[in-house]
């Protein structure tokens, strides 16, 4: 990425990550350019796939989704077809905020958000345990979010 964008692009991205609704004129003032080149740079970064979209950031706490659990998942089959089946099925569970395939002592790490432990237990029993090829799971309840970043460091 360092060859694709310069310091001005990084400043633009930094400002957009902080406030995607910033008017282009204000953004231009902050980065020291006029409106037209800033708009062109944004369009170019969208076209090259650096900016993939703009979305509202919701407060899970305000929505009552205060319970976060990380779940280790071990599969009984890790051939490609089994992985594809698991991937497709886990994408259908809205409570799963993040899912990563892991190299290590287990196969996947899920971040699951729910209202409380009772709801999590239901999600585990009815949805996660029923995913294709699941052999075992281990749950870790988060007690406090110490760092939560919504964008990569530039």
UniProtKB/Swiss-Prot annotation:
Q: Which GO terms describe its cellular component?
A: cytosol
Q: Which Pfam families match?
A: AsnC_trans_reg, HTH_AsnC-type
Would the keyword DNA-binding turn up in this protein's UniProt record?
Answer: yes
Return the CDD domains for the record. Answer: HTH_ARSR
The UniProt keyword set, sorted, is: Activator, DNA-binding, Transcription, Transcription regulation
What GO molecular function annotation could you give as one example from this UniProt entry? sequence-specific DNA binding
**Domain HTH asnC-type as annotated: residue spans:** 5-66
**DNA-binding residue intervals:** 24-43
Might you name a Gene Ontology BP term for this protein?
response to amino acid
Q: Which PANTHER family match?
A: LEUCINE-RESPONSIVE REGULATORY PROTEIN
Record function comment: Transcriptional activator of the putA gene in response to proline.
Q: What is this protein called?
A: Proline dehydrogenase transcriptional activator
Biological source species: Rhodobacter capsulatus
Gene this chain is encoded by = putR
């Amino acid at each position: 990425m360092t060859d694709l964008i310069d310091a001005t692009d990084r400043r633009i991205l930094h400002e957009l990550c902080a406030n995607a609704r910033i008017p282009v004129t204000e953004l231009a003032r902050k980065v020291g350019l006029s409106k037209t080149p800033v708009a062109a740079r944004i369009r170019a970064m969208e076209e090259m796939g650096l900016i993939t979209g703009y979305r509202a950031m919701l407060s899970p706490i305000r929505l009552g989704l205060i319970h976060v659990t990380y779940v280790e998942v071990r599969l009984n089959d890790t051939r490609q077809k089994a992985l594809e089946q698991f991937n497709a099925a886990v994408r259908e569970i809205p409570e799963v905020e993040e899912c990563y395939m892991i190299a290590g002592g287990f196969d996947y790490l899920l971040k699951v958000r729910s209202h409380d432990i009772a709801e999590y237990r239901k999600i585990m029993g009815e949805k996660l345990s029923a995913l294709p090829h699941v052999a075992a799971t281990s749950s870790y309840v988060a007690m406090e979010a110490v760092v939560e970043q919504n964008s990569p460091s530039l």
